[in-house]
């Protein structure tokens, strides 16, 4: 199978996962990041800062729209150079609260789904996956770099 096709299929699949995760948060008026952040095991002080009443609405907004826009970007193949790195950062921010450092999780989850997503998103940026059947490719063919 062709490398470009694999990048395209993987980009759209990961995009769908991110879009779905964002939309389910957007349409649920009761959704909040508070439960996830409040249970942070690593860097608890950092994550508890996001729980402050004046900051939590912004945290929720950034989660909902960050995932939704990341999904749209990946599916459309638009701005992948940037959204891949920003998405990887978001995945790392999701990773640390569940990590009970220096202990490894019950099922050896030192590497969990967030790390895999982060690595895949970085690969999308490095290999400019949006240039393959995406708006980045269209923009490049029409306007150059």
Features from the language model and the residues they span:
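Extended, low-polarity transmembrane helix blocks
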Residues: 1-38, 42-69, 76-145
């Amino acid at each position: 199978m062709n490398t470009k096709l694999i990048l395209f299929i993987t980009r759209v699949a990961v995009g769908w996962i991110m879009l779905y995760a964002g939309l389910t948060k957007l349409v649920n008026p009761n959704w909040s990041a508070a439960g996830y952040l409040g249970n942070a095991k690593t860097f608890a002080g950092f994550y508890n800062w996001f729980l402050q009443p004046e900051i939590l609405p912004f945290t929720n907004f950034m989660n909902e729209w960050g995932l939704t826009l990341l999904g749209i970007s990946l599916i459309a193949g638009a701005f992948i150079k940037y959204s891949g790195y920003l998405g990887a950062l978001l995945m790392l921010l999701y990773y640390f609260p569940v990590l009970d450092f220096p202990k490894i999780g019950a099922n050896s989850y030192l590497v969990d789904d967030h790390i895999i997503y982060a690595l895949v998103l970085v690969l999308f940026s490095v290999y400019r996956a949006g240039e393959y059947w995406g708006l980045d490719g269209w923009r490049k063919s029409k306007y150059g770099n």
